[in-house]
Amino acid sequence: KNVDKKDYDSRFNNTCNQRVNIDLISEDIKSSYEKLYNNLNTFEGKMSLDKIKDTDYYKEFVTKMLYRYRASVYDKNAEDPYCWMSYLLKNYKSEEVYDFCKKAFAKMKKEKIRVEEFLSPDIKSKAGRVSIKYFVGIRVLDEMVDLYRSFGENGIDCYIVSASFIDIVRAFATDKDNNYRMDKKKVLGLRLMKDDAGRILPKFDRNFPITIREGKVQTINEFIKNDRNYGPIMVGGDSDGDFEMLTFFDETEIALIINSENTGSIESLRKKAIEGYSRFYLQERNVNEGRFVSLEKS
């Protein structure tokens, strides 16, 4: 839902150099998932997860889900164009999202940081064989933890305003094992509707702004600012989705750009930071070690 139907960029051609699109890849994902569902012992089958992992349909499902996430772009003409990734969580409850996210975070923190290539098996499929490279590993940034704590100790409230689905961000930011230990109420993000049973629906909750670009400014103005406080004295971000938040508020003394080398409008702010503008600062990082560094290039 809400994914552009046109062929993917040629960078994502299959191994036979043929174009692929969301309809083709979705058929393969559906087919492999049905096999997983019918064979995995936690669903309708008798096979353990360890044995399932050796099957072609497991490898097909994992590779093409990762490929779908990386290759797909949102449909700019859709009603809620940005939300398509979160729609994958349809029918989950918040507690279930929290649970599997925390398990995933715990596992990824133990993984060696690396770039891994996934290749789908040589089986009959609609999209053909595809490969995709993925960054594996997640780390708690000690420098960021120290910053949050220092602010808190000096009476400065810290908030997270993320473009990601709110339940996923809260699962990470509030987890005691991740050291951030944020107050759940101070972690804001994309919100979806839920049914009467609390299950997530693939529909944006219009009681809240979409937390990207201008929507992040709206979120701060509507849900953080009040008669007893004012705009943020410091804002951090790394992409175009943060541009308005980094530039909008007159009260902001420090706009910290985390250098992830994303392209777009954020490049102009990186340039200002390098040129020495008093408001903008560039923070480099060592992605291989999961930490911030005092260098001119990440």
Predicted regions and their residues:
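C-terminal cap/substrate-recognition subdomain and adjoining C-terminal extension
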Residues: 75-76, 92-298
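A metal-dependent, Asp-based hydrolase signature
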Residues: 2-134
